[in-house]
Amino acid sequence: MIILCFDYGIKIIGIAIAETKLNYSTPIKSIFNNKKKNFWNQINIIINMWKPKYIVIGYPYKIKKKINKKIKKFAKEIKKKFKINFFLCDENYSTTEALLFLKEKKKKKKYCLHSISAKIILDSWIRKNI
């Protein structure tokens, strides 16, 4: 079963994918979240290419931020546009964990940080739900 995960950020959206039959997940892409909403074209391509059964979206439950409303709006748009069930998953500390991973790998690309965060969120959701 294919599952996609989005780490929605104000500037960048990280994307990861999992294949549960293979017990494997990987970061696949980070896309810029711009005010013109051009990112929907890229999300459309990714969803149509992978045809996921579920979509997981990172959500900071323990922290009340303005981003929470934007994440919920993004999640509702996913459901409306693609008719795919989504799940919100606690994303607290996923960026910190991704930064530690990048430090170990001696990579400091902020761009890939978000897709690695998405992978961490996805792995967490799979451990709890699959």
Swiss-Prot record:
Record-level GO cellular component terms: cytosol
Q: Which GO terms describe its molecular function?
A: nuclease activity
Q: Does the keyword Phosphoprotein apply?
A: no
Location comes to: Cytoplasm
Q: Which Gene Ontology BP annotations are present? A: rRNA 5'-end processing
Give the family from UniProt.
Belongs to the YqgF nuclease family.
Please state what the protein is called.
Putative pre-16S rRNA nuclease
Q: Which gene encodes it?
A: yqgF
